[in-house]
Swiss-Prot record:
Molecular function terms, GO-annotated: rRNA binding; structural constituent of ribosome; transferase activity
Gene3D superfamilies named in the record: 2.30.30.30, Nucleic acid-binding proteins, Ribosomal protein L2, domain 3
Composition bias type Basic residues, residue spans: 209-220, 258-287
Protein name: Large ribosomal subunit protein uL2
Organism of this sequence: Acaryochloris marina (strain MBIC 11017)
Example of a GO biological process term: translation
InterPro entries: NA-bd_OB-fold, Rib_uL2_dom2, Ribosomal_uL2, Ribosomal_uL2_bac/org-type, Ribosomal_uL2_C, Ribosomal_uL2_CS, Ribosomal_uL2_dom3, Ribosomal_uL2_RNA-bd_dom
Length: 287
C-alpha cells in the first residue's frame, strides 16, 4: 500500500492524504459472504444514547470474515484482495479446494494466487494458521485467539502483529501490539505474519466531512457547555473546571483513571502491563 497526496485545490484537500488502493484487485464483494448491517447510531434497544458522537455516515454491508480458520488441512488459494468498509485492514477472498469460499484478513505481502492452509501441521508461512504451541519463538502472528475455538480476537487491525516470546508447559507467552505481555493456552490458534495495510495510521483525514462519512460526529468540550450539561461547564468566559481533576459528564474521574477491575480473572495471565496512554490525568485537560 502507498499513500496518495493531493494538491491544495481546496481547504479540504490541503492536508488530506488517502490510500492509493494499489493492492485492491476487486471492487465488488462476494455476494454469498455479505449481509445487511443495521447501525445502531450509538443507541440501545430503548433508543437512549449510550455511546456519544455516533450517527450518520455512509451505508455499509457487512463482510463475513473467517476469524476461526477452522478448515483444518484444506488448502485454499487467495483469489482477490478487497476493500472492507468495516475495518482499516484489507480482506482476502480464499477459494478452498473443496469449493467453499471465505474471507480472511489480508496478511502483509500475501499476493493473489498464494496457497494457504490451517492446521497443526501447516508450514510456517505467512497466511497459514497454527496452534501457538507449533509456532517458533520470535514469529510474528495476528488474529490470535483468547480462548481455543472461539476465533481470533487480538491483533486484527491494519498493521497489527503480536510476537511469540516464550513457551512453558501449557502456556505460550505473546507480546501484544499494546506492549502487554500475556499468557495464552497453547491450543489457541494464530495466523502467521502481520496484518496488511500497514500505512493506515499515517493517513490524514484532512477535513471534518471525512469523519462524518465514517459516522463520527463532533466532540464538544465539557468546558464550553452549560453547568446543566457537564460538570466542567459554566463560569464567566474561559473558566477552569473547578475540580481537582477532569471528570466525565456523569461525574466519574477520567483521563488516567483506572477502570479495570482489580480482581479480574485474567489478571493472572498478564505478565507485563501495556504501555501507559499519553492521556493522563492533568489539571487543565478537558473531556
Amino acid at each position: 500500500m502507498g499513500i496518495r497526496y493531493y494538491r491544495p485545490y481546496t481547504a479540504g484537500t490541503r492536508q488530506k492524504t488517502s490510500s492509493d488502493f494499489a493492492e485492491i484487485t476487486r471492487d465488488r464483494p462476494e455476494k454469498s459472504l455479505v449481509k445487511a448491517k443495521h447501525r445502531a447510531k450509538g443507541r440501545n434497544n430503548r433508543g437512549v444514547i449510550t455511546s456519544r458522537r455516533r450517527g450518520g455516515g455512509h451505508k455499509r454491508r457487512y463482510r463475513i470474515i473467517d476469524f476461526y480458520r477452522n478448515k483444518l488441512g484444506v488448502p485454499g488459494t487467495i483469489a482477490t484482495v478487497e476493500y472492507d468498509p468495516n475495518r482499516n485492514a484489507r480482506i482476502a477472498l480464499v477459494n478452498y479446494k473443496d469449493g467453499e469460499k471465505r474471507y480472511i484478513l489480508h496478511p502483509r505481502n500475501v499476493q493473489v494466487g498464494t496457497t494457504i492452509v490451517a492446521g497443526p501441521d501447516a508450514p510456517i508461512e505467512v497466511g497459514n494458521a497454527l496452534p501457538l504451541e507449533r509456532i517458533p519463538l520470535g514469529t510474528e502472528v495476528h488474529n490470535v485467539e483468547l480462548i481455543p475455538g472461539k476465533g481470533g480476537q487480538l491483533a486484527r487491525a491494519a498493521g497489527a502483529l503480536a510476537q511469540v516470546v516464550a513457551k512453558e508447559g501449557k502456556m505460550v507467552t505473546l507480546k501484544l501490539p499494546s506492549g502487554e505481555v500475556r499468557l495464552f493456552q497453547k491450543e489457541c490458534y494464530a495466523t502467521i505474519g502481520q496484518v496488511g495495510n500497514v500505512e493506515s495510521n499515517n493517513i490524514t483525514i484532512g477535513k471534518a466531512g471525512r469523519n462524518r462519512w465514517k459516522a463520527r460526529r463532533p466532540k464538544v468540550r465539557g468546558s464550553v457547555m452549560n453547568p446543566v450539561d457537564h460538570p466542567h461547564g459554566g463560569g464567566e468566559g474561559r473558566a477552569p473546571i473547578g475540580r481537582s481533576g477532569p471528570v466525565t459528564p456523569w461525574g466519574k474521574p477520567t483521563l488516567g483513571y483506572k477502570t479495570r477491575k482489580k480482581k479480574k480473572q485474567s489478571n493472572k495471565l498478564i505478565v507485563r502491563r501495556r504501555r501507559r496512554s499519553s492521556k493522563r490525568s492533568r489539571g487543565g485537560r478537558q473531556s
